[in-house]
Design a protein with these regions (language model features):
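Cleavable N-terminal signal peptides of Sec/SRP-targeted secreted and luminal proteins
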Residues: 2-20
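Short, conserved catalytic/metal-binding motifs centered on acidic residues
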Residues: 69, 78
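Short, flexible N-terminal segments of the mature chain
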Residues: 52-61
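Accessory, solvent-exposed terminal regions and/or long lumenal/extracellular loops of proteins
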Residues: 634-636
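Catalytic-domain carbohydrate-binding cleft regions of carbohydrate-active enzymes
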Residues: 23-48, 55, 66, 81-82, ...
Length: 636
């Protein structure tokens, strides 16, 4: 226990967002520091924070005059300031090398980083301490977070927490009692790799604790304070018709004949399509942005022919240039790669190159050169748009500099990458996002494995979509139907269930060919594409709503019942807006399905039967044809 803290209490008047705009409420919340615990009390209880955990025992805190509450321990100072319905907690170290606070996880918590298991809520998956940076989590499964991550969390008790940019954040979810449930959300600030700081800059940790009457209210009041809404809508045809990618079907064994046959197979079997996406291994050398002349002897002729059949054509691309490519030397000589402080290019290693330069998207000249090559490729071949892969800061070399404020390293790379590629418009896709919610583009889930389970399999699909929406990325592209088939291809049942789980998400993406199974699989997938088309007008309406309010398109069940335990933990169903609920079948051989229905009258599409919520029902006689969804009846 740090001496000098007992009995220090500050009563603040904090405006808590009201559920009625015409009748605003003001609640008396109490900020209480006692026994090394900072308590932010609100309508449903309190947020308990074990704070100052690296301050030596016996250190006395002296009251200071800054902010609304201030304590100076000599080795560090904490200032607490009222900021609308939030408390801003600001730590500055004078001699400490680490600052650490832990929020006790009462209730259920959501948000933070994209994960391999993607638990919903997040306390289901304890996590070791790791730097909170965008990363290719496939490289270190269970350790790294993914490319779509924000230091933003909300709780079922009506709290929202945001760690400010510029904090060198290491984060953990420790299980302190061995029950496999995380007990704390811990923030640690350290000036260690992969973070950097200006010389002589003090170590700081700044975060907000905001409150509302419930989880939805806390989110809708707090989200606009920290993030921007999309400024428009992405490509309508991608919302409507499936993307067809060559990746999972052919992986790198792609050429013009296979692309043509792939497209003709789609068309001859009567599937709708938005575009054919030519994935990995079309380049002569990775990063040259030139077609391989042996695999694609006349790319313009191929693209023109595909256009003639009604297909748009997109290309996979990435931010690397392998050092054996002709364009490497030019980019190196002109300083377009990420460099060290002496201006020397630092190479990285990625999945298609042991030695590569990484384009520095914080360098305006590098961005102009790199994007112009893609524009030239479009002009010369007729390519319509691009799939932008990678972009995570984990690919940055260990020794690096960026052309932005050092306090924002390394995550600023991801932000600048998305800012740069978004210039190509709403027909693109990325797989990363951090502070880039304003761009009206599709954001793809990282590659899923072709398995049923929670370890990057089918059962992570819905939690991932919920996670993306909560962080402000409404236009979710759930990657390949059936997974990426890296080890084995999915069987027919898994493939059908995967397609059905995608039905009511914002976009569909096929790669593994449905007709490679049997006629039943083909028909089931056609049913999926048909149903998806029917919900597009609702998607467009919700997209327009997202531009104004920031509300997600794909919503958690608790959106309509934030006080009900069953709603707070429902992780395999989702709302599309407020009046449509989808509950995909995600267990092998399932013949029954439990569904949590929020308040209201809910009509089961398959039978027309109406259920009065809130209620949990068990549907019987589930078959491989079952696509379970409900619509909420209008109230009189």
């Amino acid at each position: 226990m740090k001496e000098g803290l007992l009995g220090i209490t500050l009563v603040l008047l904090i405006a808590t967002p009201s559920s009625s705009e015409n009748n605003p409420e003001t609640c008396h919340n109490t900020l209480d520091i006692d026994d090394d615990i900072l308590r932010v009390q609100h309508a449903k209880g309190q947020v308990n924070i074990d704070f100052g955990l690296t301050i030596p025992n016996g250190t006395e805190g002296v009251t200071c005059t800054e902010g609304d509450q201030c304590l100076d321990y000599g080795v560090a100072k904490v200032i607490v300031t009222q900021d609308e319905h939030c408390q801003k907690i600001s730590w500055t170290a004078t001699s400490l090398t680490e600052l650490k606070d832990c929020i006790r996880l009462e209730g259920h918590w959501y948000g933070g980083g994209e994960q391999i298991r993607q638990p919903w809520p997040i306390e289901k998956e304890p996590r070791p301490e790791t730097p909170f940076v965008t990363a290719d989590m496939l490289q270190k499964r269970g350790e790294w977070y993914g490319g779509v991550s924000e230091a933003y969390w909300i709780s079922s008790q009506g709290a929202a927490v945001r760690v400010e940019e510029g904090t060198p954040l290491f984060m953990s979810l420790p299980d302190n009692d061995g029950d496999s449930i995380a007990d704390q959300l811990c923030f640690s600030a350290k000036q260690e790799l992969p973070f950097a700081a200006p010389e002589a800059a003090p170590l700081t940790m700044n975060y907000y604790v905001c409150t509302g009457n419930d989880v939805k209210e806390a989110h809708m009041a707090s989200y606009p304070k920290f993030f921007a809404n999309p400024t428009g809508m992405p490509d309508l045809q991608m919302l409507t018709d499936p993307v067809w990618s060559t990746w999972a079907e052919y992986h790198t064994a792609v050429n013009d004949t296979r692309v043509w046959d792939f497209a003709m197979g789609i068309k001859s079997r009567g599937f709708n399509f938005s575009q054919v996406e030519i994935d990995d291994n079309w380049e002569a050398c990775y990063g040259d942005a030139i077609f391989n002349p042996e695999r694609f002897p006349d790319p313009k002729q191929l693209v023109d022919a595909l256009h003639g059949e009604g297909f748009r054509v997109t290309l996979w691309t990435h931010p690397f240039i392998n050092d054996d490519c002709p364009s490497y030397a030019y980019a190196d000589q002109n300083g377009y790669f990420i460099k060290d402080e002496n201006g020397t290019t630092q190479q990285t290693r990625w999945w298609q190159g042991l030695h590569a330069g990484m384009i520095d998207f914080t360098n305006e000249d590098a961005v102009i050169w790199w994007t112009q090559r893609l524009v030239d490729l479009q002009i010369n071949t007729g390519i319509d748009s691009f799939k932008f892969d990678a972009g995570e800061s984990s690919w940055i070399p260990d020794i690096f500099t960026l052309n932005v404020n050092e306090l924002l390293w390394p995550n600023a790379f991801t932000t600048k990458y998305v800012d740069s590629v978004s210039s190509f418009g709403g027909m693109i896709e990325t797989r990363v996002g951090m502070g880039t919610q304003r761009h009206p583009i599709f954001v793809r889930m990282l590659d899923k494995d072709s398995i049923w389970g929670e370890f990057n399999g089918l059962r992570t699909l819905v939690p991932s979509a919920l996670h993306f929406g909560l962080l402000g990325y409404p236009y979710v592209l759930p990657d390949m139907i059936g997974g990426n088939a890296y080890v084995i291809k999915p069987n027919a049942e898994l493939f059908i269930r995967w397609a059905q789980a995608n039905t009511f998400m914002p976009a569909l993406q096929f790669s593994i060919l449905p007709w490679g199974f049997d006629e039943n699989v083909t028909e089931r997938c056609k049913e999926v594409t048909s149903l998806h088309t029917e919900i597009v007008p609702l998607m467009v309406q919700l997209g327009q709503e997202a531009m104004v309010s920031g509300a997600p398109i794909i919503r958690p069940t608790w959106w309509l019942c934030p006080d009900l335990e069953a709603c707070l933990t429902a992780d395999q169903q989702f709302l599309v807006g407020d009046n449509f609920l989808a509950a995909p079948v995600v267990y092998e051989g399932a013949t029954t399905l439990d569904v949590v229905l929020p308040p209201g009258q809910w009509r089961l599409a398959a039978t027309g039967e109406v259920y009065s919520g809130p209620i949990t029902i068990t549907l019987q006689d589930i078959t491989i044809e079952s696509i379970i969804y409900f619509t909420r009846e209008a109230t009189a």
